[in-house]
Amino acid sequence: MSKKMFGEIMRQAQKIQEEIQKKQEEVKKMTVEATSGGGMVTVQANGAGEIVSIKIDREVVNPDDIEMLEDLVLAAVNEAIKRAHELAQSEMAKVSMPFNLPGMPDLSSLFGKL
């Protein structure tokens, strides 16, 4: 491999790294939403998978049936985290796609966790 070719590969690697960092910051600012109980519980998560908001409709709050509320919150939280993970993978794949070369591993697998 010539020095010129190696230099070009290094420039490409630096460009990829910069694009990945930029996209990671963008993804962290994105949000997804999930609901359960027909919209009685709504959870929002950011692209990093952090829960940023939980809203519970008053009608679902029953002191005699806390277990149902817990189940609804758990279901909505799990779905929000799943959607945040899917969002992050989808967005990061957009960055890695142009740089996937024949014979090179798929880079999108590196972005499962932000």
UniProtKB/Swiss-Prot annotation:
Gene3D superfamilies: Nucleoid-associated protein YbaB-like domain. PANTHER family: NUCLEOID-ASSOCIATED PROTEIN YBAB. Keywords: Cytoplasm, DNA-binding. The keyword Cytoplasm applies. InterPro entries: YbaB-like_sf, YbaB/EbfC. The lineage of its organism: Bacteria, Pseudomonadati, Nitrospirota, Thermodesulfovibrionia, Thermodesulfovibrionales. This is Nucleoid-associated protein THEYE_A1069. Belongs to the YbaB/EbfC family. One of its GO terms (molecular function) is DNA binding. It comes from Thermodesulfovibrio yellowstonii (strain ATCC 51303 / DSM 11347 / YP87). One of its GO terms (cellular component) is cytosol. SUPFAM superfamilies: YbaB-like. It is found in: Cytoplasm, Nucleoid. Binds to DNA and alters its conformation. May be involved in regulation of gene expression, nucleoid organization and DNA protection. Homodimer. NCBIfam families: DNA_YbaB_EbfC (TIGR00103).
